Amino acid sequence: MGCASSKQFKRPPGYEEPAVLAAQTTFTVNEVEALRELYNKMSYSIIKDGLIHKEEFQLALFRNSRKANLFADRVFDLFDLKRNGVIEFGEFVRSLSVFHPKAPKSEKTAFAFKLYDLRGTGYIEKEELREMVLALLDESDLHLSECAVEAIVDNTFSQADSNGDGRIDPEEWEEFVKANPASLRNMSLPYLQDITMAFPSFVMHSEAHD
């Protein structure tokens, strides 16, 4: 009897109590439980081991498991807090919390900075910004000329690099975001505010009504 019970209630890899995650994030307990269902769908979509691998992450959030994209890679890497190549449930909830409309702007600002700081130096350099702009355009299927991309990069640096050292530090980035709030528009996902009702219509469309 005891063996059957332990199998029935075996917890998946990286399981954390919803109440604990709710206390540490912007989500409510009910929202965390809804995210658990979403996580289960994602983590069993390809490899089926209860962990989210990069292919599954890209398929769910970026609609493509094979197309290489720097933006998708960066988001995955930042969600993978343990740096072990997979996203566990706790990592998924904590990282996704940053995108909640009610998450503090300071958290969104810090996450966006890390997104652009490709080499983890603590600064955003011109080449890093250029690479991310190109990746974001590619993800959106938008195509700009090389001159237009350079203009975006140069304009950003002319506004953000206040001390003129050729790179953007966290303080400069914070001031830039305050002056240009639209720069964080991709850091809020409105459906997370209604996750218990909206799930899972925003991802995994082909599997949402199994």
Swiss-Prot record:
Record-marked site positions (Involved in dimerization): 140
Induction, per UniProt: By drought stress and abscisic acid (ABA).
Residues that hold Ca(2+) according to the record: 161, 163, 165, 167, 172
MF GO annotations: calcium ion binding; kinase binding
Coiled-coil stretches noted in the UniProt entry, renumbered to this chain: none
Membrane disposition: Lipid-anchor
GO biological process: calcium-mediated signaling
InterPro entries: CNBL1-10, EF-hand-dom_pair, EF_Hand_1_Ca_BS, EF_hand_dom
Binding partners and assembly: Homodimer. Interacts with CIPK24.
Function of the molecule: Acts as a calcium sensor involved in the regulatory pathway for the control of intracellular Na(+) and K(+) homeostasis and salt tolerance. Operates in synergy with CIPK24 to activate the plasma membrane Na(+)/H(+) antiporter SOS1. May function as positive regulator of salt stress responses. CBL proteins interact with CIPK serine-threonine protein kinases. Binding of a CBL protein to the regulatory NAF domain of a CIPK protein lead to the activation of the kinase in a calcium-dependent manner.
Protein name: Calcineurin B-like protein 4
Lineage: Eukaryota, Viridiplantae, Streptophyta, Embryophyta, Tracheophyta
